[in-house]
UniProtKB/Swiss-Prot annotation:
PROSITE patterns named in the record: D_ALA_DEHYDRATASE
Functional note: Catalyzes an early step in the biosynthesis of tetrapyrroles. Binds two molecules of 5-aminolevulinate per subunit, each at a distinct site, and catalyzes their condensation to form porphobilinogen.
Lineage summary: Eukaryota, Viridiplantae, Streptophyta, Embryophyta, Bryophyta
Keyword Lyase: yes
Gene Ontology CC terms, in alphabetical order: chloroplast; cytosol
NCBIfam families: PRK09283.1 (NF006762)
SUPFAM superfamilies named in the record: Aldolase
Protein name: Delta-aminolevulinic acid dehydratase, chloroplastic
A Pfam family matched in the record: ALAD
Length: 432
């Protein structure tokens, strides 16, 4: 019947009989009188078909129930007079030229559990749903949305209307978690990033606005100095180029408290300074925010896949790179050191970033902690898929859903992805 619905839907104004003929699945169907009621559609009158269509399928007239008792029926079967049933279907024929061979002798044939959609669904080990997505949102001080050239389909959202509209779209398809990233005016940037903890800054204002409109929305925030730093680094830079660790952590604590005070549900230190999780936890608790969670960027690698993100926020380092504080892409075991530290310091969620190039690290964390794992499908991963799809090199929907499924399969509980709304729409459509 799915074929019936698709054929009819693809032929505007068609009669159902035309659709049935077109799809060749009209066996067992008969014309019905033009009576409209639940599940009945006239085959003679043109119609606009709804998304779901129930067409009456009638084979033979249903026989009246037999007056015989259950005991009589059972006795007939025992006596060898079993009632007639449809014959066993003939085995489908192989194409001409197929060699005639004896079946392979093998007790285990894994394909048996894959032979139908129902069996595949029954034994599916990993699932994804909109509840698994966190939508990253870029915000700026302007009133209008501004497209991001390196991230087709993504925009810097005007902090009032654009932000609200995007969250409406997300919630409409079941995505109720967002993370905010600010594009800060250059005039507000400084070497110490003091704007990061301004209670009336862009992020605190966005948090208050969203909580006023959507009290149950889960708001994650980014805790780092790079959007606010005139140097473009995640920490305070000494004159010799060294990123100062402890002084930076002091600033991050004030930033996290300001975000929590505005109403953030989860603060997310992405800076990769040593000891920042424990210091932020202590600062939050002392400020009365014991219920605000920390999502630690535990294994954040110094990756080439961040390029489009830095364009979106204009947060490229003014000199050097971030290799003295972000992890070496060649390292695997080092992620366990960061995991144990963050867990001991009070992290509530552990993150791996990027996601797809580091599926092995996601699995490593999953096997070594009971805490929830998040993974960030970063801007470079997003833009790669979009570019390949635009060039006709792959099917965007299939590639996106497969990539997200692989991240979940590796062990991530939640995924930060720019595809959140689109993927949720696809998933919802599949369940209709």
């Amino acid at each position: 019947m799915v074929g019936v619905m698709m054929a009819a839907a693809a032929t505007p104004g068609c009669g159902v009989s035309q659709a049935l003929t077109a799809c060749g699945s009209h066996e067992g169907l008969r014309r019905v009188a033009p009576v409209f009621g639940p599940g009945v559609v006239s085959v003679s009158a043109p119609c606009k078909l709804p998304r779901k269509l129930n067409v009456q399928a009638v084979a033979e007239p249903i026989a009246k129930s037999s007056p015989r008792t259950i005991e009589e029926c059972e006795a007939n079967v025992v006596a060898g007079n079993a009632p007639a049933a449809p014959p066993v279907p003939a085995k489908p024929s192989a194409p001409e030229g197929t060699p005639a061979i004896s079946p392979l002798v093998m007790p285990a044939r894994p394909r048996r559990n894959r032979r139908s959609p129902a069996l595949r669904a029954a034994f599916q080990e990993t699932t994804i749903s909109p509840a698994n997505f966190i939508l990253p949102l870029f915000v700026h001080e302007g009133e209008q949305n501004a497209p991001i050239g390196a991230m087709p389909g993504c925009q810097r959202l005007g902090w009032r209307h654009g932000l609200i509209d995007e969250v409406y779209k997300a919630r409409d398809v079941g995505v109720n978690s967002v993370v905010l990233f600010p594009k800060v005016p250059d005039a507000l940037k400084s070497s110490t990033g003091d704007e990061a903890y301004n209670p009336d800054g862009l992020v605190p204002r966005c948090i208050r606005l969203l909580k006023d409109k959507f009290p149950d929305l889960v708001i994650y925030t980014d805790v780092a100095l790079d959007p606010y730093s005139s140097d473009g680094h995640d920490g305070i830079v000494r004159e010799d180029g060294l990123i100062m660790n402890d002084e930076t952590v002091h600033q991050l604590c004030k930033q996290a408290v300001a975000q929590a005070q505005a109403g953030a549900d989860v603060v997310s230190p992405s800076d990769m300074m040593d000891g920042r999780v424990g210091a932020i936890r202590k600062a939050l608790d002392l400020a009365g925010h014991q219920d605000v969670s920390i999502m630690a960027y535990t294994a954040k690698y110094a990756s080439a896949f961040y390029g489009p993100f830095r364009e979106a926020l204009d947060s490229n380092p003014r000199f050097g790179d971030k290799k003295t504080y972000q992890m070496n892409p060649a390292n695997y075991r080092e992620a366990l050191i960061e995991t144990r530290m963050d867990e001991a310091e009070g992290a509530d969620i552990l993150m791996v970033k990027p996601a797809m190039p580091y599926l092995d690290v996601i699995r490593l964390l999953r096997d070594n902690t009971a805490l929830p794992i998040s993974a960030y499908q970063v801007s470079g991963e997003y833009s790669m898929i979009r570019a390949a799809a635009a060039a006709g090199m792959l099917d965007e929907k299939k590639a996106v859903l497969e990539s997200l499924l692989s991240i979940r399969r590796a062990g991530a509980d939640v995924i930060l992805t720019y595809f959140a709304i689109q993927a949720a729409q696809w998933l919802c459509a599949e369940r209709v």
